Curated annotation (Swiss-Prot):
GO CC annotation: membrane
Gene: DTX25
GO BP, sorted A to Z: xenobiotic detoxification by transmembrane export across the plasma membrane
Descriptive protein name: Protein DETOXIFICATION 25
NCBIfam families the record matches: matE
GO molecular function: antiporter activity; xenobiotic transmembrane transporter activity
Length: 497
């Protein structure tokens, strides 16, 4: 009997071990599947941002070799008006990401095309409101005391910025629309081809045609609109048969709720874009301003490249959360959040360690000055900590965007960045004389507080309740498929007629 009992015990133990191995294998497969889904979104999204940033850098490089005044005018226009407007438009496009992601998860595919058309209407309207600011950029800069010659050059080049502004409306919204339905490869391919076209077109316009700064901006417009046109062809040409059923009068319904969500989205993201610009502006008033600005700009450049990875991961977090909320699976939402946070934390630790390891050596890629190198090395610790925080914070923002919490994130950004980060930086620089390290420490404090608040909010979020809210939003905003089809102008239907 004792022998039989021992055998039974052994079989139970073996069965338990087998069950544990099965559960472990299932978990590994589940994690790997989630990681693959995440990178399918994050890689093309990152590539899009890197290539878009590259097109702006190409224009600046060609302008710099053509005219010092032109370079100063372009840099001033880029760092103030274009960056300001781009931040708002990029933020507003995240509303498209939220709605399309949730609609895709809920299998309300026909609504994705409607949401895309509504975003075109709303974003084009907002972009048009900014046109007078671009037209009056020169007088505004002169009013602010900027150099007259540079501001007059801005008067010459502003017309080239207006078509670029409208290209952003379409490229950003269509990117979010395609990204929400996992059609990511086309985004990366078009972005890469656009950069190649941008280099070729800018070289031709500047070096061959002798158009100078105007040629550089023409090249930028050619590349940006080529992406928009290619995306139009992809969407209209039948590659999105379930989500694009043609133009519809339903696009003009529920524009006010769409406008509210878009504005809160734009406000949320633009606060992050402006934060670094304000910090750089403040560095110009620090002791040894030339060294301070140079060192700060180098650190900002490193920080900006890392931000491209961050925003790619943010897009992945947003789409995955929105998709699973649309499906009504709260457990899958939690699992997606855990996976993307772990992956981003690993990337953050690696980038942070590289920054610490190479410290001042990084500066020699941009400057031969020993003083600048020492200043960058002095900032390397706070820069590495910033990178670590910065890789986590966008993920949390992406989760919030996927759930439609843009207004909450905007308030958190406003409080942590502008009520804490900027004032603390000013205090450390001008009262305690900590120099640019104090300025960056103030910025780091703002990012750190924002990260902690978002961590708490995401941790306390009732995802079952968010699923219910998503279902209610889908019911409120979703049109019945037959009704949509009756108001749809389909090119293929017209051809058959």
């Amino acid at each position: 009997m004792s022998g039989g009992g021992g055998e039974m015990e052994e079989r139970l133990l073996n069965g338990s071990e087998t069950e544990q191995r099965r559960e472990s294998l299932y978990l590994r497969k589940k994690i790997w599947s989630e990681v693959r889904k995440m990178w399918r979104i994050a890689l093309p999204s990152t590539l899009f941002r890197v290539m878009s940033f590259g097109c702006v850098v190409v224009a600046q490089a060609f302008i710099g070799h053509s005219s010092e005044t032109g370079l100063a005018a372009y840099a001033l226009l880029q760092s103030t008006f274009i960056r300001f407007i781009y931040g708002i438009m990029a933020g507003m496009s995240s509303a498209t990401e939220t709605l399309c992601g949730q609609a895709y998860g809920a299998e309300q595919y026909h609504m994705m095309g409607i949401y895309l058309q509504r975003s075109w209407i709303v974003d084009t309207f907002i972009a048009t409101l900014f046109v007078p600011f671009i037209v009056l950029a020169g007088p505004i800069l002169r009013l602010l005391g900027q150099n007259v010659v540079i501001s007059e050059t801005v008067d010459e080049i502003y017309p080239w910025v207006i078509p670029y502004l409208y290209s952003i409306v379409f490229t950003m919204t269509m990117q979010m629309y395609l990204q929400a339905q996992m059609k990511n490869a086309i985004i990366g391919i078009l972005s890469t081809l656009a950069l190649v076209l941008d280099i070729a077109a800018t070289w031709w316009c500047v070096s061959v045609m002798g158009m100078g700064i105007h040629g550089a901006l023409l090249g930028l417009n050619i590349s940006s609109w080529s992406v928009a046109i290619a995306e139009f062809v992809y969407v209209f040409g039948g590659w999105c048969p379930h989500t694009w059923t043609g133009f519809s009068t339903a696009a003009f319904l529920d524009l006010i709720p769409m406008l509210k969500l878009s504005i809160s989205s734009g406000f949320m993201l633009c606060l992050e874009y402006w934060y670094m610009s304000i910090i750089v502006l403040m560095s110009g008033y620090a002791k040894d301003a030339n060294i301070a600005i140079s060192a700060f700009s180098i650190c900002q450049y490193i920080y900006s490249w890392e931000m491209n990875i961050c925003f790619g991961l943010m897009g992945a977090a947003c789409v995955r959360v929105a998709n699973e909320l649309g499906k009504g699976d709260a457990d899958a939402v939690r699992f997606s959040i855990k996976v993307v946070l772990v992956v981003s934390a690993v990337i953050g630790v690696i980038c942070s360690a590289l920054c610490l390891a190479f410290g001042g050596q990084i500066s020699y890629l941009f400057s031969d000055s020993q003083a600048v190198s020492d200043a960058v090395a002095d900032l390397s610790i706070v820069l590495s900590i910033s990178i670590l925080f910065n890789i986590i914070q966008p993920i949390l923002s992406g989760v919030a965007i996927g759930a439609g919490m843009q207004s909450m994130v905007a308030l958190v950004n406003l409080a942590s960045y502008y009520a804490i980060g900027v004032p603390l930086g000013v205090l450390l620089v001008y009262v305690f004389n900590f120099g640019i390290k104090g300025l960056w420490s103030g910025m780091l404090a703002g990012v750190g507080i924002q990260t902690l608040i978002l961590c708490y909010v995401i941790y306390k979020t009732d995802w079952e309740l968010e699923v219910k809210k998503t279902n209610e939003r889908m019911k409120t905003w979703t049109l019945n498929l037959p009704a949509v089809q009756s108001t749809t102008i389909s090119t293929r239907d017209e051809e058959r007629k």
